[in-house]
Amino acid sequence: LIFTIDRIMCQGSWLDYGMFVQNVMVAARARGLHTCPQVAFLQFHRIITEHVGAPPNEMLVCGMSMGHADTSAPINALVTERAPVSEFARFIE
């Protein structure tokens, strides 16, 4: 999947767009599919936007792979460490 956004959209729209992309990922999982959002596609933005026929006012946000994960592939066994919530959030009671 290739995601683009109109260049005139302001910062708040980028937040909305991120939530939209996340919901695509959640919907995919609900249907048994795996996803991998990929911002690395941005380095090829000129080639990609031209290839998909995006108008000049659209800019590339990200790409996303979607399908069935190969659970036997060693790369799919990678589990990264997560910071505890207390490192980035403070709860006020």
Which residues are covered by each model-predicted region?
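Gly/Ser/Thr-rich beta-alpha loop segments that engage phosphate groups in nucleotides
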Residues: 34, 55, 69
